[in-house]
């Protein structure tokens, strides 16, 4: 089944797994494998259901609980994910406070991204900021270990430790949190937070109850409202942008976000640096040209990439709101390289924006991602295309 999944034969992989489950329905590894196959196909709801079945075979298994929580967060089911992680955190400490104390980036980053997809900017910004603080703590705490390591004379481990500290900002969780925080800052700049309106449309987190013997510091701003009011300006992102420009030059999404942040701030120099990294380090000259507002010559574009076609379609819509982007995105579909599911979703949104025909496009994408229709429904449930 794993080999079939690697070859993108989703139906064949699921058939093998169903046969195995019929033989041994109590083997949770089969459910985990099925969840991964479904996730790769875009069927995130069915993937979460498979993880639920695996987790319920042994509720005391922490790995299964964390995997189930992450699958729920992919679907935007934040409240249910909170309930799942409560199985193994301390009973006398609120779940979110405990996860923050544990520096659980694996939960906080996807949870923040789920809030972002919902449009809940304050809570998303709060969690992204928590993760950024974790990495600051990692760097600051290193100084407690220098003397200890030298006293123990474990110089090989010390050498590895120094290299690990140098690379801490290259971590994928840091990049995702940094990009998410910048997006939140841009959203707050475009539409400043109306606290009264937010309180009317969202249920605020109640204050925690201190049980006897429980020692923890209250989070006085669990919903991020005070944080947005105090540190919700574009200038707050200066340090984050500096780290991304140093350690994430090869991350295309990070460079696009830095460019958008710098353009909104009016920082021409930073825009040029981000575009140069996209062009020279990420090897995406079309992305750099599009962001800089340069005209992309259609004849010179490699149309075997759906990502390139999306850029052409967006350029056509900019120049002419009634442009036919359907043919740009779908012509000679069979000659294209296999696109990523995120590119497929972005192309779907472009078609919807241009009021194009989306049903045939979804049918084409399902040749690659059997669960794409489900993926679109989940994304559009929270996001406006």
Predicted regions and their residues:
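Structural motif corresponding to the intra-repeat A-B loop/turn of tetratricopeptide repeats
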Residues: 6-7, 41, 75, 118, ...
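Short coil turns that delineate tetratricopeptide repeat
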Residues: 25, 59, 93, 136, ...
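"A position-specific structural signal for the A-helix of alpha-solenoid helical repeats
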Residues: 33, 67, 108-110, 117, ...
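Acidic, serine/threonine- and proline-enriched intrinsically disordered linkers and terminal tails
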Residues: 182-234
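Residue-level signature for tetratricopeptide repeat
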Residues: 2-3, 37, 69-71, 114-115, ...
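Acidic, Ser/Thr-rich low-complexity linear motifs
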Residues: 94-102, 137-153, 194, 291
């Amino acid at each position: 089944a794993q080999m079939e999944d690697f070859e993108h034969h989703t139906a064949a992989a699921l058939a093998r797994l169903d046969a195995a489950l019929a033989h041994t329905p109590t083997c949770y590894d089969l459910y985990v494998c099925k969840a991964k196959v479904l996730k790769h196909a875009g069927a995130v709801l069915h993937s979460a259901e498979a993880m639920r079945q695996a987790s319920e075979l042994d509720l005391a298994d922490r790995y299964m609980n964390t995997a189930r929580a992450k699958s729920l967060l992919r679907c935007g089911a934040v409240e249910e994910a909170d309930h799942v992680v409560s199985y193994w955190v301390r009973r006398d400490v609120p779940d979110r406070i405990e996860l923050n104390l544990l520096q659980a980036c694996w939960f906080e980053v996807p949870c923040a991204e789920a809030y972002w997809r919902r449009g809940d900017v304050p809570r998303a910004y709060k969690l992204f900021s928590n993760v950024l603080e974790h990495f600051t703590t990692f760097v600051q705490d290193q100084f407690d270990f220098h003397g200890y390591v030298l006293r123990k004379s474990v110089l090989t481990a010390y050498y590895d430790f120094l290299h690990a500290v140098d690379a801490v900002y290259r971590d994928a969780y840091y990049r995702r949190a940094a990009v998410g925080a910048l997006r939140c800052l841009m959203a707050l700049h475009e539409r400043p937070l109306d606290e009264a309106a937010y309180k009317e449309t969202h249920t605020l987190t109640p204050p925690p109850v201190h049980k006897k013997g429980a020692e923890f510091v209250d989070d006085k701003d669990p919903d991020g409202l005070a944080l947005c009011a105090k540190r919700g300006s574009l200038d707050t992102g200066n340090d984050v942008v500096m780290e991304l420009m140093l350690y994430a030059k090869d991350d295309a999404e990070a460079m696009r976000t830095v460019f958008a942040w710098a353009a909104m701030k009016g920082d021409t120099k930073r825009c040029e640096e981000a575009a140069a990294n996209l062009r020279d380090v990420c090897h995406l000259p079309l992305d750099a040209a599009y962001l800089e507002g340069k005209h992309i010559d259609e004849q010179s574009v490699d149309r075997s990439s759906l990502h390139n076609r999306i850029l052409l379609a967006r350029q056509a819509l900019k120049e002419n709101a009634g442009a036919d982007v359907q043919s740009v995105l779908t012509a000679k579909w069979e000659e294209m390289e296999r696109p990523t599911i995120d590119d497929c979703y972005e192309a779907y949104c472009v078609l919807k924006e241009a009021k194009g025909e989306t049903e045939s496009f979804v049918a084409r994408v399902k040749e690659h991602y059997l669960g794409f229709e489900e993926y679109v429904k989940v994304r559009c449930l929270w996001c406006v295309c």
